[in-house]
């Protein structure tokens, strides 16, 4: 089968009256377009423009998007690396790590197409269009990014639910929300998301056309991708096929998780306030160790509330938009705002905002988690971290005997964690009476701990 057709002079519009009559008769039959090359009326194929707003997309996808992705890749890769260290493995951190990987792929997968087509200027070279351009655009911009976004969406729900169980039912959380179960839930979310995203990969096949096309009353010299329905789409019917796909995506992966996130976020905030009152009561009762543990738990919960809230702020508008779009398409309701240029511009802006929030999560981790900061320094600034460790050991040698030995030890253990996942502690930390003796280093690992 010939997938690429070249014919006609791009600077000479067909002017034969016979061809014009054929073209007009074709359009009157509700055909897709009239092919001036083969002089055939095309009914089951559709032209697919690679862009809708050239100038806007050149700026957004060609200039802004690569910079945003660069920051997002660094931030999410750093988060995934830090949370992969053995001493950082907790149920909460496991979810955060997989969220970072999913969010990284949301930005990284479209990058080859945006660099090739927009940044490298091939948007102005469509006369060189080849078949692989069509498939690259489809899979990198349309098929796979929504799948990874679905995964990130449900992982955020898992994160909020896991944390709510941890603070509301701490005894049950150790068995129900352990690392093994969290990884199993992540696998189920990933597989389900890919299965629900598969229909988008099997809706159309492609060919290319280079020649004169008559459509909407005008002749156009087109170098364009042409979509052809697959056998699955033809047998099911386009209305049924796309209604199932978009309603599943809208309800199961946008509206429902958004509703659950609003609910769980509210419950988390309520739980944090209750835990704060408990901490104050423990302090009044002079149970300082329990109060310190409660403070750490509250800090983790506050960090997760911040992450979930940011995720909701940028994704709720998309949820509302997708819900309206599905209702209008299913019941053929006309809403002026959903016609014209608004939907495309809204989605472009919304996608950029989503990518721009990913580095913010990294900032939240650094600001609110001391263990994250320390592990990050050990991974990416090992020299500075070792110097800091040595200085604190020196400081410990000057501590008076009135200070508790456990205070010194816990202080050093918190800082001197090396990049291999080991905690590095001087013997002086373990035996405060011999702080002035020659230092020898001991290494030990922490056990996996639940929240």
From Swiss-Prot:
Role description: G-protein coupled receptor for the neuropeptide like protein nlp-38. Plays a role in several types of aversive gustatory associative learning including gustatory plasticity and salt avoidance learning. Its role in salt avoidance learning may be through activation of the transcription factor crh-1/CREB and de novo transcription and translation, which in turn promotes the formation of long-term memory.
Reported tissue expression: Expressed in head neurons including the ASE sensory neurons and the ASI and AWB chemosensory neurons, the midbody neurons SDQ, and motor neurons in the tail.
UniProt cross-references to Gene3D superfamilies, sorted A to Z: Rhodopsin 7-helix transmembrane proteins
The protein's name: Sex peptide receptor-related protein 2
Sequence ranges on the Extracellular membrane side: 1-63, 119-140, 205-251, 323-334
Membrane topology: Multi-pass membrane protein
UniProt subcellular location: Cell membrane
Keywords of this entry: Behavior, Cell membrane, Chemotaxis, Disulfide bond, G-protein coupled receptor, Glycoprotein, Membrane, Receptor, Transducer, Transmembrane, Transmembrane helix
Top-level taxon in the UniProt lineage: Eukaryota
PROSITE patterns assigned to the protein according to its UniProt record, in alphabetical order: G_PROTEIN_RECEP_F1_2
All ranges on the Cytoplasmic side of the membrane: 85-97, 162-183, 273-301, 356-451
One Gene Ontology term, aspect cellular component: plasma membrane
Entry-linked InterPro entries: 7TM_GPCR_serpentine_rcpt_Srw (IPR019427), GPCR1-related_rcpt (IPR053071), GPCR_Rhodpsn (IPR000276), GPCR_Rhodpsn_7TM (IPR017452)
BP terms from Gene Ontology: chemotaxis; G protein-coupled receptor signaling pathway
Species of provenance: Caenorhabditis elegans
């Amino acid at each position: 089968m010939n997938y690429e057709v070249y014919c006609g002079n791009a600077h000479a519009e067909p002017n034969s009256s016979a061809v014009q009559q054929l073209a007009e008769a074709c359009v009157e039959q509700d055909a897709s377009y009239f092919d001036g090359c083969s002089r055939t009326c095309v009914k089951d194929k559709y032209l697919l423009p690679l862009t809708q707003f050239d100038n806007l997309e050149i700026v957004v996808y060609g200039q802004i998007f690569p910079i945003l992705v660069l920051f997002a890749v660094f931030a999410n890769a750093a988060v995934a690396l830090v949370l992969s260290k053995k001493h950082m493995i907790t149920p909460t951190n496991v979810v955060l790590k997989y969220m970072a990987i999913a969010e990284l792929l949301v930005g990284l997968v479209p990058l080859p197409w945006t660099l090739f087509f927009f940044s490298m200027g091939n948007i102005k070279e469509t006369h060189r269009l080849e078949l692989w351009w069509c498939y690259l655009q489809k899979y990198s911009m349309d098929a796979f990014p929504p799948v990874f976004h679905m995964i990130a969406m449900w992982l955020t729900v898992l994160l909020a639910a896991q944390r709510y169980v941890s603070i509301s039912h701490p005894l049950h959380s150790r068995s129900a929300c352990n690392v093994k179960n969290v990884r199993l839930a992540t696998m189920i979310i990933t597989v389900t998301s890919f299965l629900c995203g598969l229909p988008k990969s099997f809706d159309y096949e492609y060919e290319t056309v280079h020649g004169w096309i008559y459509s909407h009353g005008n002749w156009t010299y087109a170098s364009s991708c042409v979509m052809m329905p697959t056998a699955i789409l033809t047998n099911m019917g386009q209305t049924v096929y796309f209604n199932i796909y978009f309603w599943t995506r809208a309800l199961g992966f946008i509206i429902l998780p958004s509703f659950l996130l609003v609910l769980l976020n509210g419950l988390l905030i309520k739980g944090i306030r209750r835990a704060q009152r408990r901490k104050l009561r423990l302090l009044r009762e002079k149970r300082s160790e329990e109060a310190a543990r409660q403070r750490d738990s509250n800090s983790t919960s506050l960090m997760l509330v911040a992450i979930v809230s940011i995720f909701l702020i940028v994704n709720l508008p998309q949820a509302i938009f997708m819900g309206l779009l599905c209702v209008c398409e299913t019941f053929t309701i006309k809403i002026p705002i959903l016609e014209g240029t608004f939907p495309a511009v809204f989605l472009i802006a919304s996608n950029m905002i989503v990518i721009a929030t990913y580095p913010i999560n990294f900032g939240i981790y650094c600001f609110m988690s001391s263990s994250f900061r320390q592990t990050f320094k050990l991974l990416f600034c090992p020299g500075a971290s070792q110097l800091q460790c040595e200085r604190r050991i020196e400081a410990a040698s000057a501590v008076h005997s009135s200070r508790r030995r456990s205070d010194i030890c816990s202080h050093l253990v918190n800082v001197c964690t090396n990049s291999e996942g080991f905690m590095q502690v001087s013997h002086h930390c373990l035996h405060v009476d011999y702080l002035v003796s020659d230092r020898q280093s001991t290494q030990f690992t922490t056990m996996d701990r639940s929240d």
